[in-house]
């Protein structure tokens, strides 16, 4: 097996011929259960039908009308749990490869320089968004379509949030994200980077300048485990992924690594280590395979790279670089040693600087995305729901509509 490069996509895309061939497998269901299963309402049933009839522009328009991050979602969405699970073709042989068809169309859109988005009218007043991650980016597009003048305030030097700083380049190339953001900026969305709302800029200042404010602060901080405080060479998964991403994979890796966790972030860490040349990578999760949190796509690709995945064990003791695990249901014990230990045990947002916003367990209390302050809304990872990119897109769209409804009512009073 040839060596995988960190900057090269792990999964190859479709050629036009292969895309048409795959789309021709579609049963053209009238009720399109695949479309019903998409949280972002990207409508795969409709765009696959367009591919089937060689109407690639129509397919691109369908995707972009519903999902401003269509090219991103095509690469990182857990489609096997969503649209592909709903695919009727599964009852015959296997589901349509919806993700790669969506990727083919969004790549074709870029290659042929399609102009689907048009600049907004900016006649309904100004709205501010805090955070340029997937929820904030999608909300900005929906609000711009509705006629608002939108400014996004981003703490980091570049927009994208977790898409830029956390997801490895072999899953999501930076060029793809840059192209998505360029389209959004061309619509007239203003993105201000290096702006720390809650720090140098207060929420009160934004409220005074804008008709409404949408918070889409992501869960950019990795969690740790007290058990590992005295362990040697421990790193938080979020920090490791960001380090690798910023250096385009040009970082040193250990001879052996032990990852604690079984989600998509743990799989990304394990895959990154393997691709960068770490000979021995082991991932240990407390969940058993039947309830494994990682998507099937990520789990399978990580295993294919040669990562050892152990399920059903939880850490109970640490001594230097040695970790002892107990099985969650049985009496089994396991001790593993590695040069580096990486913790992928969850993430949280920094909400300390937003004391005026009510939050519990890192989730902001909202009603239809509206906080206790009627002019402040929240979406993305900091509201209840799945912590996936496609769900962030969904909440961004819905929060934008909620803001529009609120401002329309305010005008009619």
From Swiss-Prot:
Its EC number is 1.3.1.1. InterPro entries: DPD_II, FAD/NAD-bd_sf, FAD/NAD-binding_dom, Helical_ferredxn. Gene3D superfamilies: Alpha-helical ferredoxin (1.10.1060.10), FAD/NAD(P)-binding domain (3.50.50.60). It is an enzyme of class 1 (oxidoreductase). NAD(+) binds at residue 287. Keywords: NAD, Oxidoreductase. GO terms for molecular function: dihydropyrimidine dehydrogenase (NAD+) activity; iron-sulfur cluster binding; NADH dehydrogenase activity. It catalyses: 5,6-dihydrouracil + NAD(+) = uracil + NADH + H(+); 5,6-dihydrothymine + NAD(+) = thymine + NADH + H(+). Pfam families: Fer4_20, Pyr_redox_2. Involved in pyrimidine base degradation. Catalyzes physiologically the reduction of uracil to 5,6-dihydrouracil (DHU) by using NADH as a specific cosubstrate. It also catalyzes the reverse reaction and the reduction of thymine to 5,6-dihydrothymine (DHT). Belongs to the NADH dehydrogenase family. PANTHER family: DIHYDROPYRIMIDINE DEHYDROGENASE [NADP(+)] (PTHR43073:SF2). Heterotetramer of 2 PreA and 2 PreT subunits. This is NAD-dependent dihydropyrimidine dehydrogenase subunit PreT homolog. It comes from Salmonella typhi.
């Amino acid at each position: 097996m040839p060596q995988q490069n960190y900057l090269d996509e792990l999964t190859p895309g479709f050629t036009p011929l292969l895309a048409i061939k795959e789309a021709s497998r579609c049963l053209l269901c009238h009720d399109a259960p695949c479309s019903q299963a998409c949280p972002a309402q990207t409508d795969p049933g409709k765009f696959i039908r367009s591919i089937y009839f060689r109407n690639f522009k129509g397919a691109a328009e369908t995707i972009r009308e519903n999902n401003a991050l269509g090219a991103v979602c095509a690469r990182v969405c857990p489609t096997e749990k969503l649209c592909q699970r709903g695919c009727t073709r599964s009852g015959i042989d296997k589901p349509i490869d919806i993700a790669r068809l969506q990727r083919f169309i969004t790549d074709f859109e870029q290659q042929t320089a399609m102009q689907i988005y048009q600049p907004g009218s900016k006649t309904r007043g100004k709205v501010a968004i805090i955070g340029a991650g997937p929820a904030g980016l999608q909300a900005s597009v929906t609000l711009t379509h509705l006629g608002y003048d939108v400014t996004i305030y981003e703490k980091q030097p570049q927009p994208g949030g977790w898409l830029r700083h956390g997801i490895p380049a072999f899953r999501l190339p930076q060029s793809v994200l840059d192209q998505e953001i360029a389209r959004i900026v061309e619509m007239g969305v203003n993105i201000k980077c290096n702006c720390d709302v809650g720090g140098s800029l207060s929420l009160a200042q934004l409220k005074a300048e804008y008709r409404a404010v949408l918070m889409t602060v992501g869960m950019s901080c990795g969690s740790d485990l007290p058990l590992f405080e005295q362990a040697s060479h421990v790193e938080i998964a979020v920090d490791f992924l960001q380090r690798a991403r910023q250096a385009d994979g040009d970082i040193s890796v250990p001879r052996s690594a032990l990852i604690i966790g079984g989600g998509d972030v743990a799989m990304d860490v394990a895959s990154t280590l393997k691709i960068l040349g770490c000979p021995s990578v082991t991932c240990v999760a407390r969940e058993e395979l039947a309830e494994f949190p990682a998507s099937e796509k990520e789990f399978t690709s990580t295993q294919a790279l040669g990562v050892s995945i152990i399920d059903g064990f939880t850490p109970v003791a640490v001594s230097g670089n040695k970790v002892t695990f107990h099985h969650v249901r049985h009496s089994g014990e396991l001790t593993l040693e590695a040069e580096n230990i990486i913790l992928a045990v969850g993430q949280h947002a920094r909400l300390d600087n937003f004391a005026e916003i009510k939050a519990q367990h890192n989730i902001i209390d909202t009603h239809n995305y509206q906080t206790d302050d009627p002019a402040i809304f929240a979406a993305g990872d900091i509201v209840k729901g799945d912590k996936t990119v496609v769900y962030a897109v969904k909440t961004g769209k819905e929060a934008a509509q909620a803001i529009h409804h609120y401002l329309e009512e305010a005008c009619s009073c």
